[in-house]
């Protein structure tokens, strides 16, 4: 499956953005699909978007004048987390794929191994910008801003503000300092993505942070067969998310990309679906080996 990951990412991005003619019209799809969240980071304001961004939808609920915990969106995210974990990041997220395409540009690449403390930032973004600020920093009528979407998310500029402003002169005339700020963030992510592998995913994405909480318990896991592993270290060197799959098969940073599977010379690493620890493997008995 990992060999076809690029095609799966392209297909997922297309399914998430089915209404392509809207790019020329300068309008948004407002059908029933917008009441359903998509699994990856994809802006609601993208003209082609066929569903709602779960992070944006969650903020809209907690920031409303009548605060109520979003059981539907939270339940949806928990379900996806339990079923797939960060497989969504590696296979189904449009913005993750965008960063990977940028990283393919032939330039010198930089390692993020010494920058591991930055991976904890995304949990702060999830807690503070997605939940606490929209819920408790409100205006006179009791409404909070969607702080992550409004002030940090680069996907909103890439998919929403830029295409809409190009097609709509009214929107173009209304662009101001906030757009300049968000555009600078997008530009920074683009430059960093050329040099580093998935910098936004590693350091700032709150959706990835949420799915990471379920990586160790999700049904979709990485499995390491200790009987086949020769401790060559090729899997760890191949991992661009800085994970040693032989030590922590279902690390919170693992996006199930499958690079370790392709690098393993003995086929000791594999995907598995179901309950159980990825490190556990049933050793063959002498009788079984003799068969």
Provide a role label for each language-model segment:
Residues 1-246, 252-291:
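Non-ligating segments of multi-cofactor redox enzymes
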């Amino acid at each position: 499956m990992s060999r076809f990951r690029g095609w799966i990412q392209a297909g997922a991005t297309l399914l998430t953005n089915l209404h392509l003619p809207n790019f020329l019209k300068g309008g948004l799809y407002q059908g029933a699909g917008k009441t359903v969240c998509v699994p990856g980071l994809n802006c609601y304001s993208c003209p082609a978007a066929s569903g709602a961004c779960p992070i944006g939808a969650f903020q809209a609920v907690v920031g409303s004048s009548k605060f109520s915990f979003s059981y539907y969106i939270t339940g949806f995210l928990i379900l996806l987390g339990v079923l797939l974990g960060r497989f969504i990041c590696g296979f189904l997220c449009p913005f993750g794929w965008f960063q990977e395409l940028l990283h393919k540009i032939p330039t010198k690449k930089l390692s993020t191994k010494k920058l591991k403390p930055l991976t904890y930032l995304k949990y702060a973004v999830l807690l503070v910008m997605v939940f606490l600020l929209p819920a408790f920093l409100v205006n006179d009528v009791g409404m909070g801003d969607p702080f992550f979407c409004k002030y940090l998310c680069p996907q909103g500029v890439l998919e929403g503000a830029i295409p809409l402003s190009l097609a709509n002169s009214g929107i173009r005339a209304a662009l101001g300092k906030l757009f300049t700020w968000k555009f600078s963030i997008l530009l920074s992510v683009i430059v960093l993505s050329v040099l580093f592998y998935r910098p936004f995913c590693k350091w700032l994405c709150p959706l990835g942070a949420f799915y990471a909480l379920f990586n160790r318990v999700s049904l979709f896991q990485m499995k390491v067969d200790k009987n086949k592993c020769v401790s060559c270290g090729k899997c760890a060197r191949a991992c661009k998310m800085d994970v040693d799959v032989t030590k922590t098969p279902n690390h919170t940073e693992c996006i199930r990309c499958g690079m370790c599977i392709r690098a393993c010379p003995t086929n000791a690493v594999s995907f598995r679906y179901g309950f159980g620890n990825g490190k556990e493997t049933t050793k063959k008995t002498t009788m079984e080996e003799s068969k």
